[in-house]
């Protein structure tokens, strides 16, 4: 048993319901932008795109990856879409992103993604509108009931696949994250929210149960290097 599975079995049996300051609706736009810039720095340091670039080509097939319409749910600053689009472009692939967020932020001028304001729980798109629906580290902000709604909607609007990545809830990750963020010089508020985020994260069994409730066919759930949890599923006939 690896150390992260041992810590998972010993601690953090239930998700925390403590709210993050990051989610406070009354925060001024300037403060939200500053927080997202700091969060983007953390995400880049921990290579938040790695589960996507390491798994999508072999899973979907390189021929299928040549051209993709992708929805990023809870896109924030759109950083994931920019990183993945650039990565795909270097391989001669065309990945076109639609960034959905409840409160969209202004994107850099060079960002070609479409921006849509909307809820992950009621996506404003027709059935089967996208080749792929992704979400990165936004699912832990939701209650279990809303996770089911979020995934059911993601499954509805994809014509092929969903790929959801979030935080794995375990004490080993929790113990290592705080010192790492301090060494990076991350501010105290984001550090506190990051620790809450881990406690709001998930175990593999929980995601399998939630995927079943969302009526997702043949879901695959795995733990990624002890820190992240990944749900991937494709519709039948693919």
Where are these regions (language model features)?
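Conserved beta-strand signature within the Rossmann-like core of class I S-adenosyl-L-methionine
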Residues: 159-167
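Class I SAM-dependent methyltransferase SAM/SAH-binding core
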Residues: 71-73, 77-122
């Amino acid at each position: 048993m690896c150390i992260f599975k041992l810590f998972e079995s010993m601690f953090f049996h239930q998700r925390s319901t403590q709210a993050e300051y990051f989610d406070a609706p009354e925060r001024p736009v300037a403060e939200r932008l500053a927080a997202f810039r700091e969060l983007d720095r953390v995400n880049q340091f921990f290579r938040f795109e790695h589960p996507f670039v390491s798994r999508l080509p072999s899973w979907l097939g390189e021929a299928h990856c040549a051209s993709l319409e992708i929805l990023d749910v809870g896109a924030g600053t759109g950083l994931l879409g920019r990183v993945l689009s650039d990565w795909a472009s270097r391989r001669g692939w065309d990945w076109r992103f639609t960034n959905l967020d409840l409160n969209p932020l202004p994107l850099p001028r060079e960002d070609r993604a479409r921006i849509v304001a909307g809820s992950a729980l009621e996506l404003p798109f027709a059935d089967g509108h996208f080749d792929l629906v992704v979400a990165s580290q936004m699912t832990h902000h939701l209650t279990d009931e809303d996770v089911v709604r979020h995934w059911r909607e993601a499954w509805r609007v994809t014509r092929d696949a969903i790929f959801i990545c979030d935080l794995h809830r375990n004490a080993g990750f929790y113990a290592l994250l705080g010192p790492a963020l301090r060494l990076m010089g991350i501010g105290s508020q984001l550090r506190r929210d990051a620790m809450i985020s881990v406690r709001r994260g998930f175990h593999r069994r929980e995601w399998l149960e939630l995927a079943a409730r969302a009526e997702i066919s043949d879901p695959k759930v795995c733990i990624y290097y002890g820190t992240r949890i990944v749900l991937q599923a494709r519709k039948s006939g693919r």
